[in-house]
């Protein structure tokens, strides 16, 4: 079978890019011909590295250009592609490009939605602006704008669903959200395929003695989705109480300087900014994994961390958190119904930090 993965940025650092590389390599190892097509190349080489048998192709912007259409059409035809896996199903014009390029060909189109259907960066950005707006007129305007963007998102999702052979979500719990935002009642093309474990851990053997008194965050340092400031607000309540514990942040991003300034202002001494690193060694030694995102799909870091014995402490803003964690059994979830409360998150963490048996 001949497969083609299509995504916005590749090579690049991120969950979608990592999953793409892992799947491309696995399909190639199983004897399939695999191609990866991207519109933007952020880094020189992918991480993890692509198998030498996987071919990387470069398109460009604007997405709907005639040059992109001709190049994609030629690739689909000349390599006799059977399945296109669209990893960038929003905005809808990526799907429109695929359908134009596929016209008259027998290949199938799969759309993969890597987030909760009713949340994205644009919608969350407007919600954040509304929360900060002091002027009632501005708030009313932003509320209307948010409603319009939500309607546009729903229309875009309806288009992608209608023009794809299958529409893949990361959790069964997202099906209802998809139907709500699109207004669709007949959603028989929906499938659920969770993210794979993307960090190699075949040699790992859990040993409580190897675990250190460390809390861990892994991800982009940005304010829209990951909300790393919440992690630091939680840690600011914990650091004075637990002088032998450390917080490590593995990742980088546009909020790094602001987060470092917060640490300096609050005089937090045991916060380590590690930058982009292979997270596996950090998972191995961390006792707790902390994630306080405002929205997620099925976060790779939770799956990866749990596979290395790091106990997850999650903010339950995304329904798939409950697919991964059984509260009080293999981790803890702070319900999102009352909004994020750093004190409650810190109290949950403290309960685990004070009881070594709870961490094992």
Where are these regions (language model features)?
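A short, active-site helix/loop in glycosyltransferases that binds the activated sugar's phosphate group
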Residues: 147-189
């Amino acid at each position: 079978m001949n497969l083609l993965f299509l995504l916005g940025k590749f090579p690049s650092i991120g969950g979608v890019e990592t999953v793409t590389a892992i799947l491309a390599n696995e399909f190639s190892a199983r004897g399939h011909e695999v191609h990866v097509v991207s519109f933007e190349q952020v880094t020189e080489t992918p991480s993890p590295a692509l198998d030498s048998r996987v071919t990387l192709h470069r398109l460009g912007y604007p997405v709907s250009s005639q040059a992109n259409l001709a190049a994609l059409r030629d690739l689909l035809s000349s390599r006799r592609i059977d399945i296109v896996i669209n990893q960038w199903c929003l905005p809808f014009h990526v799907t429109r490009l695929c359908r134009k390029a596929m016209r008259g060909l027998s290949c199938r189109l799969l759309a993969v939605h890597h987030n909760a259907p009713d949340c994205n960066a644009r919608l969350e950005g407007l919600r954040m602006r509304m929360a900060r707006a002091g002027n009632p007129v501005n708030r009313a305007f932003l509320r209307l704008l948010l409603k319009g963007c939500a309607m546009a998102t729903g229309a875009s999702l309806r288009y992608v669903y209608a023009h794809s052979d299958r529409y893949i979500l990361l959790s069964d719990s997202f099906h209802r959200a998809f139907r709500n935002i699109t207004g669709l009642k007949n959603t028989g093309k929906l499938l659920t395929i969770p993210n794979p474990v993307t960090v190699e851990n075949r040699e790992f053997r859990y040993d409580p003695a190897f675990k250190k008194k460390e809390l861990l965050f892994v991800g982009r340092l940005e304010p829209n989705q990951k909300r790393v400031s919440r992690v630091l607000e939680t840690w600011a309540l914990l650091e004075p109480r637990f002088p032998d514990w450390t917080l490590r942040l593995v990742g980088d991003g546009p909020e790094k300087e602001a987060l470092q300034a917060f640490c300096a202002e609050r005089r937090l001494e045991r916060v380590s900014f590690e930058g982009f690193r292979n997270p596996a060694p950090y998972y191995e030694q961390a006792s707790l994994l902390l994630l306080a995102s405002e929205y997620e799909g099925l976060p790779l870091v939770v799956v990866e961390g749990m596979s290395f014995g790091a106990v997850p402490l999650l903010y339950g803003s995304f329904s798939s958190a409950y697919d991964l964690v059984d509260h009080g059994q293999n981790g803890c979830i702070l319900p999102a119904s009352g909004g994020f409360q750093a004190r409650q998150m810190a109290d949950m963490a403290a309960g685990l930090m004070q009881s070594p048996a709870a961490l094992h």
